[in-house]
Structure formats: structure tokens, C-alpha cells
């Protein structure tokens, strides 16, 4: 498996490549989609224990739903494939880590040690 792995699960892994985070299928080592872009690089990532979503953090956070049709992340685009927050317009938060605390909740830790809980709505 390549270097710069941010997270992995049974069937997927997320690899950091400069400011992008890309999802790969372990079967065939195949690129699936870009799941995030973070100014200053992605700091951390989790893949949901049920492989329903992944979350990348750094400059803000991006929750990307792991369901077809997979499409490459594009900043500011409104889509059902992902949602993002704390990424600009005067509300930028720098996150250092993310962890899953329940099947539908994640906990983000910012650069000052502050915690934020986010509920992931799955459609």
C-alpha cells in the first residue's frame, strides 16, 4: 500500500496527496474519488466503521458519503455526496483530528484542543 495513508478500513483507504485526500478501493488498488481538499494539507481522516462515509479534517471538515455514484469533491459545490463546514468566509476552523464516537456522530478536535460533535445525516 502507498505512503501517506490517512485512514483505512476493510475495503478502502484514504491517501493524502499534498492538499487533496483521495479514496482508493483496496481491491485492485483502484482510485475511487477525491474526497476532500484542504488548504495546508489534510490533517486527519476517518472511515466510518460501516464504510458509509469518511471525514477529512484540516482547514475545516468534509463529510463524504461512500455511495455510488462517486464524484470527485469540488469546493463549494452543493451535492448529496458530501457536506463541508468551517472552511472559510470568516469562519475557518483548523482541525487536527477526527474520531467516530457513535454510528452517526464524529468528534472533531481543533488546533486549540477544543471539541466539536457533528451528527452525520445519511440519506
Predicted feature residues:
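Beta-strand-connecting loop/turn residues
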Residues: 19-20, 52, 59, 103-104
Amino acid at each position: 500500500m502507498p505512503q501517506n495513508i490517512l485512514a483505512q478500513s476493510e475495503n478502502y483507504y484514504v491517501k493524502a496527496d499534498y492538499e487533496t485526500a483521495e479514496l482508493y478501493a483496496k481491491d485492485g488498488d483502484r482510485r475511487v474519488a477525491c474526497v476532500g481538499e484542504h488548504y495546508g494539507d489534510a490533517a486527519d481522516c476517518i472511515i466510518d466503521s460501516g464504510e458509509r462515509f469518511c471525514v477529512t479534517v484540516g482547514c475545516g471538515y468534509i463529510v463524504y458519503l461512500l455511495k455510488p455514484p462517486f464524484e470527485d469533491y469540488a469546493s463549494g459545490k452543493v451535492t448529496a455526496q458530501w457536506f463541508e463546514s468551517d472552511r472559510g468566509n470568516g469562519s475557518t476552523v483548523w482541525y487536527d483530528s477526527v474520531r467516530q464516537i457513535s454510528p452517526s456522530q464524529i468528534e472533531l478536535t481543533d488546533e486549540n484542543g477544543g471539541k466539536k460533535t457533528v451528527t452525520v445525516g445519511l440519506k
